[in-house]
Amino acid sequence: MNPNQKIITIGSVSLTIATICFLMQIAILVTTVTLHFKQYECSSPPNNQVIPCQPTIIERNITEIVYLTNTTIEKEICPKLVEYRNWSKPQCKITGFAPFSKDNSIRLSAGGDIWVTREPYVSCDPGKCYQFALGQGTTLNNRHSNDTVHDRTPYRTLLMNELGVPFHLGTKQVCIAWSSSSCHDGKAWLHVCVTGHDENATASFIYDGRLVDSIGSWSKNILRTQESECVCINGTCTVVMTDGSASERADTKILFIEEGKVVHISPLSGSAQHVEECSCYPRYPGVRCVCRDNWKGSNRPIVDINVKDYSIVSSYVCSGLVGDTPRKNDSSSSSYCQNPNNEKGSHGVKGWAFDDGNDVWMGRTISEELRSGYETFKVIGGWSTPNSKLQINRQVIVDSGNRSGYSGIFSVEGKSCINRCFYVELIRGRKQETKVWWTSNSIVVFCGTSGTYGTGSWPDGADINLMPI
């Protein structure tokens, strides 16, 4: 090859390489510009409209890094939108309840480090359910568990685990509390945590892991709250709190909270005479609660909360098959919707019920005097007809020979409807079982079903003779 041919060949190769590099730079430039404009757009599947990401509140910010030669291109994927829950779907139509979860905490305590607890409840965020309880600052196989029958100490804290995970040593202590309520507004968790002296307690309002607000005791007599989930609609969360006598008139208030800040307080109004430990559920556009009258009635009070104008209406469940313990036998018990029945009203237990048209679903202890056994059933006309007593779809959850305790409701939003679920506290130890010095619990959880179901009994199941003393 002569010198001229070499020069021509080298020039051709150089020109080809230069052309390729030029085309690559154009491709990189086009890609960069395209991704720059697309990082702020999300395609909306239903109608292919373009929705800007920036003005919305996002849950997570995911960035992918793509390397092309020496050029770095950042592409931001539009994240999942996070919105306040509004609970506007209808209530699911159910035929009864099916088993959902059981934590077996007491049985596991025989050979492991499990917290001593009471006052459990369940609540769900949009994607997952969690179990809560008030811990006693000790595990069961620890001498500090002696005398944990007492409700209020400075060592009690609110525990939170994924539903079905017992409260082990790695459990998160959400706040200091001997009375509590928790709920998720669609964006973050709100925890209402009461602690302090009986005559001057403090309620702390913790939102998204930060203390946002607080309120002190207004009647100087054991400020207390629901011991089950609160409810949030369109960013406004409601919680029922009582301060005052447990056996005479007390001062109940309904607090309205937005992102942890108390924005309004309404006094209880209506015909309810005594209200404690409410079990609340969303009933769009408001919130409905079924509570405990510890003074006059073994029929349960109802508190209806209007989230928009902060108004409150209260009454009593109409069903003549009443839900509290102690109570009269079913043949002689009564309820006429508006007032306490003055039947074994003193004392009581936390419980639940919810309306289904004119009917009512409810749960209660099987024993009329003790926290033993647990049953659920539907009362035809039990929400609207005074002293209605036609019972259908009865189920035994815990047989009458085994202990139960508090129970409460929680709601789960499905694709087309809102399902109602409940938990039952299964208390073990003192005061009834004096062979041991501790008092603690496990839980069992059921949810509404439109299908068929069988029978059974789901007690705590721990052999007290095998337990640490």
From Swiss-Prot:
What domain of life?
Viruses
Glycan-linked positions = 61, 70, 86, 146, 200, 234, 329, 402
Query: What keywords tag this UniProt record?
Result: Calcium, Disulfide bond, Glycoprotein, Glycosidase, Host cell membrane, Host membrane, Hydrolase, Membrane, Metal-binding, Signal-anchor, Transmembrane, Transmembrane helix, Virion
Q: Which residue pairs form cystines in this protein? A: 92-417, 124-129, 183-230, 232-237, 278-291, 280-289, 318-337, 421-447
> What CDD domains would the database entry show?
Influenza_NA
Q: Where is this region: Involved in apical transport and lipid raft association?
A: 11-33
Region annotated Hypervariable stalk region, chain positions = 36-88
Q: Quick check: keyword 4Fe-4S in the entry? A: no
Question: Protein name, please?
Answer: Neuraminidase
EC number(s) on record? 3.2.1.18
Q: How does it sit in the membrane?
A: Single-pass type II membrane protein
Name the catalytic site residues. Answer: 151 (proton donor/acceptor), 406 (nucleophile)
- Quote the InterPro entries the UniProt record gives: Glyco_hydro_34 (IPR001860), Sialidase_Influenza_A/B (IPR033654), Sialidase_sf (IPR036278)
Q: What is its main location?
A: virion
Family statement drawn from the similarity comment of this UniProt entry: Belongs to the glycosyl hydrolase 34 family.
Looking at the record, which segments are called Head of neuraminidase? 91-469
Protein's gene: NA
Catalyzed reactions: Hydrolysis of alpha-(2->3)-, alpha-(2->6)-, alpha-(2->8)- glycosidic linkages of terminal sialic acid residues in oligosaccharides, glycoproteins, glycolipids, colominic acid and synthetic substrates
Q: Which residues form the signal peptide?
A: none
The record's region (Disordered) falls at 326-350
Please describe what this protein does: Catalyzes the removal of terminal sialic acid residues from viral and cellular glycoconjugates. Cleaves off the terminal sialic acids on the glycosylated HA during virus budding to facilitate virus release. Additionally helps virus spread through the circulation by further removing sialic acids from the cell surface. These cleavages prevent self-aggregation and ensure the efficient spread of the progeny virus from cell to cell. Otherwise, infection would be limited to one round of replication.
Q: Name one Pfam family in it.
A: Neur
Residues annotated for substrate binding in this entry: 118, 152, 276-277, 292, 371
